[in-house]
Structures are given as structure tokens and as C-alpha cells.
A protein has these predicted regions:
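Domain-level signal for soluble alpha/beta catalytic cores
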Residues: 1-277
Length: 277
């Protein structure tokens, strides 16, 4: 998030204000002091380098417009929607340049979609549509409950026995032009049947808990995927982690990724066996 925003004009990182982020915890954030713009590409050179290293598909993550707005103090536009739409234009520019150098999937991270439901449905998804406008590569939106920092884990403990936040935004997302929806499932209290609301979309099912150092077994991963398959067609299910693994050690992250791969292979073989039978 900060890595992208710090390359933009109109945002002052020295002039900071305390604001409530995700409507739950206070943080010192940069200030929007003028019109925002992107003077140069931010990640294109990195994307070129990565493209040279592999022939496999590459998914590149960018911050989503609403989440960018929620991570700043706006002293210029004085409107979350206006600022989000400006960010959507900037993200669209960056996304098109990433596509041009061979990125296959561009993902927009929108944890704010799990909090500001009215704004999501009024203008948040529209901003996402603006960010993907004209792209020929596949696109994704990632909505989770945050990785394993204390502010996020404390918040999760207040959400009760069922986490139904996805229910508020899935219907409109299902009708959007976004190709993939990336979700948190394993070790969460999200009712798995909510996936029915996005049937027809490609779904990245979070089968790895990024808020724990405990490495899942392949069978645990497989169980999460089996449950998801009750509501997602097999050709549209893409196993993934709940969120990013930045807070985890490399050893733990590597172990979790191996488990994700092994668990996915278990389910893949089960599906192949059924097809043959």
C-alpha cells in the first residue's frame, strides 16, 4: 500500500495525521495535500524483471481505491468518493502498463470492503470497475479480515460466532466485471455457504491461515477446498492463502505454501478419480 502511494504526487508523508483505519484502530497516516497523480510507473520495471524469470502466469497485487482512501488523511478533495475515483484512474494507468509487460492477473486488495458496506455498494465497486476498465488480462479483488497483526486479531475476536461481512458485498461483486474474488476461509468464521453468492466467478479460496505460525497439514487444506467445492465449480476454484504472509517467518511461510500445494494435489487427484469413474 505505502509502497505504491509514496510514488504519487499530492501525498505528503511528512505531514501526518491520526485517523481511524478500517473503522477500528488509529494510525498515523500521510496527508493528501493536492491533486493526486502518478508521475511515473511504479512497479513496471519490477514486473519486467519477474517476467524474465518465469514462463508461469504472474499475478500482481495493487491496492484498491477504497482501501487507499482509508489509509490516508484527505485535506484536499474532502470526499472519500472523489479521492477514490482519482486513485482508480491512477491504478488503471499502472495496471495497463503491467499488462503490457506480461502480467497475467492484476489483483486489487480491498480489505476495506469488509467494513464500509454502504460505500462499497454505492461507489466502491464502481471505482474498482474504473480501475480495471480496458484491461484484457484477468482481474481479481482480494477481500480478507487482515493478516496477523494485533489490531486485526483483536477485531476478529469481536465479530461473533459467524462472520457474514461478505454477504453485504458479494451480490454486487457477482455482477461486476472482476474475474476473480479472493477470500479468507480457513480458520475463519465465514459461513462457507456464502460462496454460493458468487457462483460463476473464479474464486481464490483461502485455505491457509496467515494469522498463525502453525503450519497446516495437507489434509486440512484439502478439507477447506472440499467444503468450498460444494458451492464453487471445480474449474473455478483456485487454492490460495487467506492474505499476505509478510508477518510470518520465511520458514513458516514456506511450510504453509508446501501444505497448500500438497493439499491442492490431494483434491485434484480426487476430482480426477471421480471423472474417470
Amino acid at each position: 500500500m505505502t509502497t505504491f502511494i509514496e510514488h504519487l504526487n499530492g501525498v505528503d508523508f511528512e505531514n501526518r495525521e491520526n485517523v481511524k483505519i478500517r473503522d477500528r484502530y488509529n494510525a498515523s497516516v500521510p496527508t493528501v495535500v493536492g491533486p493526486v497523480s502518478r508521475p511515473n510507473s511504479v512497479f513496471v520495471e519490477d514486473a519486467k524483471l519477474l517476467r524474465q524469470q518465469t514462463e508461469q502466469p504472474i499475478k500482481w497485487a495493487l491496492p484498491g481505491p477504497m482501501t487507499m482512501v482509508d489509509t490516508l488523511y484527505d485535506n484536499h478533495y474532502k470526499s472519500r468518493e472523489k479521492l477514490a475515483r482519482e486513485f482508480a484512474k491512477i491504478l488503471n494507468q499502472e495496471a495497463k502498463e503491467l499488462e503490457a509487460v506480461g502480467i497475467d492477473i492484476i489483483q486489487f486488495d480491498e480489505p476495506a470492503f469488509n467494513v464500509f458496506f454502504d460505500e462499497v455498494n454505492e461507489w466502491g465497486i464502481d471505482c474498482l470497475e474504473e480501475a480495471i476498465n480496458g484491461l484484457k488480462c484477468e482481474t481479481a479483488v482480494h477481500i480478507c479480515y487482515g493478516y496477523g497483526i494485533k489490531e486485526n486479531t483483536d477485531w476478529k475476536n469481536t465479530l461473533g460466532s459467524e462472520w457474514r461481512q461478505y454477504e453485504e458485498v458479494f451480490p454486487k461483486l457477482q455482477q461486476s466485471n472482476i474475474d476473480f474474488i479472493s477470500l479468507e476461509c480457513h480458520n475463519s468464521r465465514v459461513p462457507i455457504e456464502l460462496l454460493e453468492l458468487v457462483r460463476g466467478k473464479k474464486v481464490m479460496v483461502g485455505a491457509i491461515d496467515v494469522a498463525s505460525n502453525i503450519i497446516e497439514t495437507p489434509e486440512e487444506v484439502a478439507n477447506t477446498l472440499r467444503k468450498a467445492l460444494e458451492y464453487i465449480d471445480a474449474d473455478k476454484l483456485y487454492p490460495c492463502t487467506n492474505c499476505g504472509m509478510a508477518p510470518l517467518s520465511r520458514e513458516v511461510a514456506r511450510g504453509k505454501l508446501f501444505a497448500l500445494s500438497a493439499g491442492s494435489e490431494i483434491v485434484r487427484k480426487e476430482l480426477s478419480a471421480r471423472a474417470i469413474a
